Structure formats: structure tokens, C-alpha cells
Amino acid sequence: MKKKLFIKYFTPVLLSGLLLVSVIGCTDKLDEPFENESFTSDVDYTIAEDMVLPLMGAYYGFYTRQWEEPLTLGIRGDDVNAAGDQVPMQEQDNFTYMASHWNTNSVWQNHYNDIVNIFTAIDEINKYREASGNNALADQYIAECKVMRAYLYLNIARTFGGCIVIDALDNIQNTPLSNKEQVMQYIVSEMTDAIPNLPDVHPNKRIDIPGGMTTYTAYAIQALAYQEMEDYQGVVSATSQIINSGEFQLSEDYYHLFKVAGKLDDENIMEFQYSDFNQGEGDRFGFLFAPFGIGGWTPVVTGAGAGWGFYEPTMKYIEFMLDRGESVRLETSVIFTPDGITELQNDYGTLPEWIDNTNREGDIFNNNARLNFASGKHIQPSTELIPGRTSLGSNKNFIVIRYAEMLLMYAEAVTRGASAGSMSADDAVNMVRARAGLTNLSGVTTQDVLDEKFAELAMEWGTRYYDMIRTESVSELSHEGKTFTMDKAYLPFPADQVAELPQLEEGIQ
């Protein structure tokens, strides 16, 4: 059902040369995150039911990600190669950094655009508070905004080694730079404040905003911050809240978790939601998955869009999985071309019979000059396209945080000496392994968990890279001709941002 909403554009804020404008969307349906709306300059803060509109605007901005973001965050791990013709990404993959690289500037700028948008949304929600007569609901909406903002800060700090934690929009240029530890402490504190005000359910059980932020999204982000701080008891505390809630379970079908069937799955703690609105033409809200795809494929559905070939699983990862006897996770994570199969046979030897250049659905992946392998977690089978749609990944959500990651984070923390909660490290790891069809482990070590995370979470949002930085695993990141040193752990602040924000020039203290 379409609604016509009349709300204002938020006041533009100048940050690093970009005018920031918040655009508000609204939804009524599970599978329709946002619909087209009309805008005017009039706002009536006495209309209590409109208090949700600024929150919807925050979600709209949060879900509107740029294609280069997940690639930039992911390409430096030993699970991914930067393929294609994007020279800055190829240089970053080889740990050659330049402050002038366009994609790192984009990641910084777009994250801060959303942070400023969220600040504005919080301010707007508070303007409706009195008319709403519902302080608890206003507090919930603000808590949801804080969770989104915390995730954005988490990304920036892990990528650049620190960032500016904004305290007021009119004081950005005077706000001192925070190092990564300080940012993580801020995130932990923000989530502690937000958690009591959030819905205490799985995101897919929310009726008002299906898939929206909940208590457990906040706990997951808090756990990630604790992990970056190497506060492993904090990791156990936060992940235990998720584990003990009974709200989450591993999907029985790892392969289809990353397809349309995985939308709002019980395993997903946070995901960016997209939709074709169940129609073959007209409005759609989506992410541009083309950079993950392979050009020149032969899809089952004639005319289905191909891809650009910018994101390639590494030979190291594939051979690691073959050594473990992995099947479903390797099939899900890696798409093979004929040249890739030949390269593997020459380097590794005999391959399992199931390895082929055709997926389960019948799409054929032909040779491509840009890459020999592609990330299956990001390539939607053509048969899942709504008739009339042709864009790669159209109608596909983008999973950000999964229950499997929380289980493995919990297990690692216990192996590092944290007091266990309701389950052992063995139990947590073996839950994930059982889904993959692997045998149980006993006496799990930290290395066992890191290996399991490598197998389970490869190609997902730079998780492997962040683990290797946290553990200072220099030798792991030095692979396939690449040489890593810890002074390359973080990207430099973008030159365009340093020019606008003088505190960045001083660097991380």
C-alpha cells in the first residue's frame, strides 16, 4: 500500500565538501523496505504517528550502500583478490596505499554522510517526542539510530585505525581524533545505553519494521567492538546474550542462506534489505551486485545481467577448503570457471568431482580475463530473478552479521581464557561444523576457531582481514606474492578529508 508522506528535507550539513540531505522513506510490508514518497517543506511535529518518519530516513540511508564499500573492506584479506581494472583496489590488495585513492575516500565520506543523517534523524525524533506522548517509543527509535551509527563507526575505525566520533554537528572540525581503542569503547558504551530501549526479539519478528535493529543487533555490534579491544570476557558476555536468547539458529541450508530464500533468516542478525516489490518492472530498491559477478556467463534466464569481475576468492582459500574436505561451504563461497579449474588442477592436483563451472541452478560460468573464480555468496542464480528483472542480484538482501559469527567469536574468546557461559568452545564450534557436514572437534584451540572462521565467513565484509590484524598474523596475509607488515594494517586518511578536517593531519595518537 503506497502512502504519500509530506515531510521536509533535513537541513544540509557541509562535511568534507559534500552537502548532506536526508531523504525519508516508509514501508508497510515485509518484502518492501521502502516505497517512493513525495516531499514538501512542511513538517507538523504535532502529528504523533509521523515520529517514525525520521527513523525510516535513517534506515533508508543505512541500506543505501555504495558498491565499492564491501569490496574496499574485503580485498586485503587472504580470502580475496582485487580483480578487474580497479587500480586503487589492486594496489590496496598488495598493501600499497595512497591517500588519493578514490574508493577509500568514498568509504569514509559515505559512512560519515550516514552518521550525520542519523544525528539529524535523532534530532527530528526528539521534536516529535512531546506530541507522541510516548517517551518509550521515542527512546526506542533513537536507540535504533544509535545501533546503525555504531556499526558505521565500527567500520571506519577498523579500516582507518581511528576516526572522529562526532559529538555535535556544528563542532565536527573541532572534534579531536579518536584512536581505534577509544572508538570501540564508545561503541560499547553506546550499545549499553541503547540495549534496554530496543525490541527484545529476533529482527524478523518485528512487526513495525521487519528486519530492523533489536537488542541482539546491539549485542552483536558490542561483541565486535569488545573483540577489537581484545576484551574477551566482554565478547563472551555480549555473545552469550544472543546465544541464550533462543531467538537465533543456524540455517539448515548454508547454500540458500545467501540466496533469496535467506532473506530475514533466523540466522541473520543484521542485513541490508532490498526489494523489487514483487514486480518485474518499475520501482526497485537494491544494491549493485555487478562488481561481484562474472562477465560472459551463460545464464539459464536469457538476458540476465552479468558482472564486472572485481572480487575473486584466492587460491589460498580454495586450497585451504579442499584440504579440509569442505564441500557445501566451498560450493557456496566460490564459483569456478574452466580456467580456474585448470589452474587448481595444475597447482593442487585431483579435485572432487562436484567442482564444475555450472551452479546448481544451471547457470554456466565461462572463462573471463578478469578472474578465474568469483564469490558465490554474492552472485544470485539467474533463476531467482523476478521475471522482467535482469540486474545481477536484483531482489537479493546483503547479510552483514550472522549468528554463526557470534558462535565462533564466543568460542575464540573462551579459548583465550574468558569464562565460558552456557556452552563450551567445542560446542559452539561444532554447531557450525555440523551444518557444514564436518565431524566434531574436541579440545578446540584458538587456531581451530580462526580456521573455522576462515572457512565459514570468507568473502564477508573483511572479517578475515580484521581477524588477522587483531592477531597480528603477518605470515597469513603475506600470500601469493603479497608482502604484509603491521604498519600496513590501516588505510591512510583520504587526502580530500584531511584537507577539510585538520585534526586528521595529526594522525592517530
Region spans (language model):
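Long, intrinsically disordered, low-complexity segments
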Residues: 26-27, 48, 86, 111-114, ...
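Conserved, well-structured interaction surfaces
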Residues: 46-64, 85-160, 174-182, 191-203, ...
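An aromatic- and glycine-enriched ligand-binding surface/loop that stacks and positions planar moieties
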Residues: 27-89, 192-198, 212-359
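Structural register within alpha-helical repeat arrays
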Residues: 142, 149, 215, 222, ...
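C-terminal substrate/ligand-recognition segments
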Residues: 336-430
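Bacterial Sec-dependent N-terminal signal peptides
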Residues: 3, 16, 20-49, 187, ...
